[in-house]
């Protein structure tokens, strides 16, 4: 039996227990216990620890940063975590060449300067960039299509690591394959570095539609879907039981305004990644606070309105129309 299969049985058991607990709470009318006050912390690197960490980020905003100053702005604005890169996605597009993991010295400086979790990106399939970040002590690794893939065919086997991973996905099949590989969090790919939320919207809607379709299928057709997605049938059944992905699903790719963040939360996102939208704008301090406010209060249009008033549209990053991008310029097609 492969390591993937052995590890998957652990996660399957864990999430079925969560599903059963959810049913019990619903049936009895009991209030759920706040996850922010765990009675016993799970051991580092266990399935429970790796999948519990992203749950604590739910409802929050994670911001891309390239230096300590930006990280401090993000923390002061109320971000739940930061993602350290060498360049913001917009600059990755403009500079061309090979985009790699950020300088470990910069990541370490950020870790020593703020109190919120610090994440960092690695290239798809780059096992040793991930090992370096794990040794550095980051809180989560993003195996990201924004960076130049090291392996065009395979992703990292994330079960071998103690640190949790996040991966991008455009649809249910991509999401389930990444979960089967050991991802602890999924995010929409969107089209990073564009300031254009349309692709993130499309990917979230595709995910929602494919989940609802899967739920309505008879068992025989769900078996076919498992083969199509190249994942165990038990993982497909877990999605059906939970009526959602079994792990946290954030929105990312082109989010630039408070209204963008609220829109993605309304579509069912568990939280928000903001890349170039904050620090390629001319009002990063206010915009960071406004996006956090809108994401946390997306159900209240009046508060989202106040958040939108905190920024100026003429200070927003210059967006890119997706239709003007050549096929080879699309980042979302990397890593399927």
Swiss-Prot record:
Biological role stated in the UniProt entry: Catalyzes the formation of pyridoxal 5'-phosphate from ribose 5-phosphate (RBP), glyceraldehyde 3-phosphate (G3P) and ammonia. The ammonia is provided by the PdxT subunit. Can also use ribulose 5-phosphate and dihydroxyacetone phosphate as substrates, resulting from enzyme-catalyzed isomerization of RBP and G3P, respectively.
SUPFAM superfamilies: Ribulose-phoshate binding barrel
Origin species: Sulfolobus acidocaldarius (strain ATCC 33909 / DSM 639 / JCM 8929 / NBRC 15157 / NCIMB 11770)
Gene field: pdxS
EC number: 4.3.3.6
Catalytic activity: aldehydo-D-ribose 5-phosphate + D-glyceraldehyde 3-phosphate + L-glutamine = pyridoxal 5'-phosphate + L-glutamate + phosphate + 3 H2O + H(+)
Active site: 121 (schiff-base intermediate with d-ribose 5-phosphate)
Major enzyme class: lyase
Pathways per UniProt: Cofactor biosynthesis; pyridoxal 5'-phosphate biosynthesis
Family that this chain belongs to: Belongs to the PdxS/SNZ family.
Protein name as annotated: Pyridoxal 5'-phosphate synthase subunit PdxS
Assembly notes: In the presence of PdxT, forms a dodecamer of heterodimers.
UniProt keyword annotation of Nucleotide-binding present: no
UniProt keyword terms in alphabetical order: Lyase, Pyridoxal phosphate, Schiff base
Tagged with keyword Lyase: yes
UniProt binding sites for D-glyceraldehyde 3-phosphate: 205
Positions of D-ribose 5-phosphate binding: 64, 193, 254, 275-276
A biological process term (GO) from this entry: amino acid metabolic process
MF (Gene Ontology): pyridoxal 5'-phosphate synthase (glutamine hydrolysing) activity
Disulfide bond residue pairs: none
């Amino acid at each position: 039996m492969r390591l993937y299969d052995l590890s998957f049985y652990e996660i399957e058991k864990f999430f079925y227990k969560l599903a059963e607990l959810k049913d019990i709470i619903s049936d009895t009318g009991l209030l759920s216990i706040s996850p922010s006050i765990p009675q016993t912390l799970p051991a580092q690197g266990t399935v429970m620890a790796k999948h519990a960490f992203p749950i604590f980020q739910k409802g929050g905003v994670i911001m891309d940063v390239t230096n300590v100053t930006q990280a401090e702005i993000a923390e002061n604005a109320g971000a739940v975590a930061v993602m350290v890169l060498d360049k913001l996605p917009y600059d990755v597009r403009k500079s061309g060449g090979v985009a790699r993991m950020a300088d470990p010295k910069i990541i370490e400086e950020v870790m020593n300067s703020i109190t919120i979790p610090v994440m960092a990106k690695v290239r798809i399939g780059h096992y040793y960039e991930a090992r370096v970040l794990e040794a550095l002590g980051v809180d989560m690794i993003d195996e990201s299509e924004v960076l130049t893939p090291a392996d065009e065919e395979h992703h990292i086997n994330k079960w071998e690591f103690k640190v949790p991973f996040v991966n991008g996905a455009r649809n249910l099949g991509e999401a389930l394959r990444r979960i089967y590989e050991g991802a602890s969090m999924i995010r929409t790919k969107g089209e990073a570095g564009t300031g254009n939320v349309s692709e993130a919207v499309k990917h979230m809607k595709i995910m929602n539609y494919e989940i609802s379709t899967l739920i309505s299928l008879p068992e025989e057709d769900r078996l076919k879907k498992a083969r199509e997605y190249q994942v165990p049938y038990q993982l497909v059944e877990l999605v059906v039981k939970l009526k959602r992905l079994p792990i946290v699903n954030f929105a990312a790719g082109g989010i630039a305004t408070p209204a963008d963040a609220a829109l993605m939360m309304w579509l069912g996102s568990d939280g928000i990644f903001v890349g170039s939208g904050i620090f390629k704008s001319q009002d990063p301090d206010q915009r960071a606070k406004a996006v956090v406010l809108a994401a946390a209060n997306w159900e209240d249009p009046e508060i989202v309105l106040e958040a939108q008033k905190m920024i100026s549209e003429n200070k927003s990053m210059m967006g890119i129309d997706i239709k003007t991008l050549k096929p080879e310029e699309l980042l979302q097609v990397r890593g399927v």
